[in-house]
Amino acid sequence: MFTRALLLSTTLVFGACASKPVQPELAGPPPAGKPGFEDGELVQAVSQHLGVTSESAASAIERLFAERGRPSAYITGEEGGGAFTIGARYGQGTLWMKDGRKERVYWQGPSVGFDVGAEASKVFTLVYDLDDPDDIYRRYPGVDGSAFLVAGMAVNVQRANGITLAPVRSGVGVRLGANIGYSSYTRKRGWIPL
């Protein structure tokens, strides 16, 4: 039984790695009249929330701005998770819209792949193309093997129904490997990560 699960997870991981990753088109600045956060605002917010230097925060923000443009919202929060081939991640935070609206959000999700370890981290998620806070509540697939490191912070991209999330994580623990899974954003805390 364990051999079948390991074979299945291996197939899924290598299949995900061999296929072209789902990447949203590179976005420039948002169209005129559409609100978006400026890089200076976000560098300060990332630095304060994640407890990193302004230079480290600027490195991550500059790369995301160059690839995706200005976000319409962001989420500040914390999360924890662990895995041994099959894993789970749980988090909570606050969604901050450019127009001043804010809302409490929770997320959880399963993963499968070559993945072992546990971590706890603070998360700063840039949110693109979100006009209504209610639209964030859905599943966002992702391949954590697609993450990149900038100044000691891990960043990956998730996308669903035209909304793109770019979580920036900084924390403690070790979780090594590559996995595929999704994060499900909800209004209430959930304990079952499906």
Q: How should these model regions be labeled?
A:
Residues F14-A16:
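C-terminal motif of bacterial Sec signal peptides marking the signal peptidase cleavage site
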Residues A18-K20:
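Bacterial signal peptide processing site
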